[in-house]
Amino acid sequence: MKIPHSKAGFGSMAAFLAACAIAWPPADGEDLPDLSQFKPLKTDSGEPVFFEDFNEGLNGWTNPGNSFTWRNQEGMVGTGCVLAERDTYDGRDLTIQKKIPLKHGIRYRLRVHYRTEMKEDPLYKWKKQEYFCIRYLDPATEKTIYAAVDSETRHEPDSKPDWTEWSHDFYVPEIYSSTILLELRMHSKRLGKVWIDDVSIEPAEAIGATLFPVRNSEMTYDPEAGITYFMKLPLNRQESDFRLLVEAGGIKKMLEPKNGYANGTFGRFPDGTLHLKATLLDMPGKAVIGVDESVLYVRDVENIPGRIVVEPDGRMIRDGKPFLPVGVYAGYNRPSDTNKLQRIRDAGFNCVEQVWSHAVYTGKKNTAKETLLASVREMAKYDLGFLCAIKHQIPQCKAKIESVDGVEGLDNVTRYIIDAIKREPNLIGYYVADENPIIQLPAIRHLRRLTSELDPWHPTMTLTCRDDHFLFFADSGDYLMFDSYPVGYFYTKDSPRQSMALSHKSIKMIRDAGAPFVWVPQIFNWNAEIKILPVRYPTAKEVRSMVLLGAIYDARAYFFYAYHCIFYQSENVDEQWANASQAARLISSLSPWLLSCESAPKAEVKQISGAEVAARAFVHEGKPLVIITADGPDECEAEIRVPGVTGLKSRYGNTEEVSPGVYRFKGLHIDSDVLGGE
């Protein structure tokens, strides 16, 4: 086996940034623009662009199956409204729909007013409500696109006899038509009555271009590396048309974008909070198209045991060595599950994610702080790291804790938690968001800033399950996590014909969101919780393939979802856990390649038939490795050409070398292979 000449990657943050972005022009006053000559970033007025009071009935609404009826005197002020009513389960969402023209580049706020009289369903006992769904349309056909939706559920098991407002922020991605299909609904698993009235959509703010500071480990300012901004410019525009005006600590500089980033050095500042303001300027159009106000922290960071430094490429350096977290969501604990940490470690995982108040492994102590500390140290006995979930510590979350151990106030409790564990050597970081709606992002960003101000040694991770929210969430953590659970979804059910194509589509997009990527692959099935619908658990091959898909796209950590779903809600526990364990051990064994800075030849994929095949080559200590995945469903075939890399062997028997450096892969449904030496 042989590979072509390889070279080491960038050795420092400063070198990396110097290679990817430059500052232009110098900060002399005469080179700075007169912002009064630029049109400010503006949105439409705050007046609703759509309003429906149903006083005129269902005019203009499509009512499939006559799901809703009009009530002319049951609305908010004794006027019109609509009603969905169901006494027996019929397996369908009750909906009405209407197309509404909007605009790209604006964040909108949908407001829906409702009241309910719910009945308990003896079959499902479903406790969530969902009153609306925004469906995006194909720009060519104006037809709906499967999975191109925006909706929100809320834990609401009981009736809401009084009129209640539900507000939801959204925007229309530029890849879709600017017209949306608004759907009002009663969830398929709820019985009773739902009244809806006064539905409006209003502009909340202009989105403009996305920009935020990046490559600052734990929000710490590095004077040698300078300040780097990520920018997502408007479609069909050239970077050369734009300049970024950055003000940091009273110093202003104009920066030139290059490959989606702009970097400049600003010198040294006194310790404390460094306030930043960046203004993205359209130079030919003389317009402001984006503004960001952020902070970094100026400080000397003590080098404590377990410190994690986030490299510019997203790699974690822990105690001076590259580190790949391979963890599992631990969920809640059952008292009878006394072997949990040992089981997780034996399965090949090196860390766990868990809400801080759920981490009880040595019994409850006199204080919550003592309980948490004892549990984190118990994890350390099993050589397990801890990703501490503080995601509930925002005002909008019902599970937030505002009083503990005599400490009062939401932020004070958060400080108390972080101060208790931030010096623990096995702490991995903090989990600050979990599939939140974008309306909660200001609170999540505040939580991230508070966390990083208190703990300069460990990163924050923020998660969304929606690819159209990547750009919004990317600045709310050091890492952007994505979870996707394609196996056994409602449309594939228990069929062997599974596909991870939608997961693949989203993962491709996350690379362009500006933050390093953490992958949350599936090891469970939601239907096990319901215990009515067919349950289709991921096979060993499917789990392996989903995990390897993340490796192709530079996942910097893996957190499998989820332990509690397998052990507390499922059947066939041993088989499911074995499938998860095989994948965890595999990805850990590949970490020297996944974390390597050695350059590798490009793996060129020629699709021959079937679902999409992806591949990537890695090199560690001169030894090549190739990872291949197939989206599924059905049979597929592809030719993977890896220039100069010959003699690789298939680990799973799906691939053969047909000529020097050319490999033929054949897969079935969700599939994968790993090519390496003997």
Predicted region positions:
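Extracellular carbohydrate recognition and processing domains
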Residues: T141-Y176
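Extra-cytoplasmic beta-strand recognition segments
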Residues: E52-F54, L94-E130, W166-V172, D198-P203, ...
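Extracellular beta-strand ligand-recognition surfaces/modules
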Residues: P33-Q37, E165-V199, T273
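Aromatic-lined substrate-binding rim segments of carbohydrate-active enzymes
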Residues: T338-E402, G406-G409, Q440-P459, P496-Q498
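C-terminal beta-strand-rich structural cap/linker in extracellular carbohydrate-active enzymes
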Residues: S659-E678
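Extracellular glycan-recognition surfaces and repeat-rich motifs
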Residues: D53-A84
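Carbohydrate-binding surface patches
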Residues: Q607-T646, S672, G677
